[in-house]
Amino acid sequence: LRSAPDNTYLTQWMKHFNNLATFLPFARAHGYEGMIETSWSTSGTYGFHYDNGWEIISMQPIRQVYPMSGFQLLIDAYCKAVNSSKAIHAETFIKEYAQQRYGLSEDEAQTFLNYFLLPQELVRHGKDAKGKPIEQVIQECEELKSNFNKIVPRKQGGEFEHYRLMLDLRINYLQYKEVEFTYESSRYDVSQASGLATQLKKIIGEAGKLDKRFIKLNKDYLKPGQAEEINALRNEKMNELYRTLSRQAGL
């Protein structure tokens, strides 16, 4: 149901649907009698604090994922796929789910489907993993957001807000990565520090609003303090870059 590189700001929805559509029929055809679902939410990705001689002082999980509270659709798709003799068809399932669970119109269901079809990749050096420039990635997300925000669910409105939040977290991450790319570029000059700091301050301000939405939606699902910890880890890198830029700019 979930796997890397999924993160709080990235979900490869169609990869997970493809797993349901291909592996479950394979398992059934090869005599599987059941499956045990396990959870290793960090996928074993940790950061380490070392002493001399590479002695480990502490370990911190560094891969945080959006809670399963936002993935009821994927859970229901899994249940349907397990209980059907035919392979699940992702696009058909998603559109029917949109209409039945959220009360969306046919046009809204198509927009809902487009949400899941949008490619999501990690971004490094100003491009995503497929080589698409970050400016284009942001533009595509913003265009989807504009259309997606027009959807008005008639049912399960609280659950639906998870989709909006995940997209906003994605955009916030991409906007930060755009600033980071400029800072890490060989063309960067310290004279740009003030402008980048101003740009990043706005992004961090938006991240603070997203933090509040994340806590509101997940406070009853996560353990006390866990939502705040996930927020802090998600924002840590952008806050560190802001401090660096502020020092360089003399702010």
Where in the sequence are the language-model features?
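Substrate-binding groove of N-acetylhexosamine-processing glycoside hydrolases
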Residues: 1-251
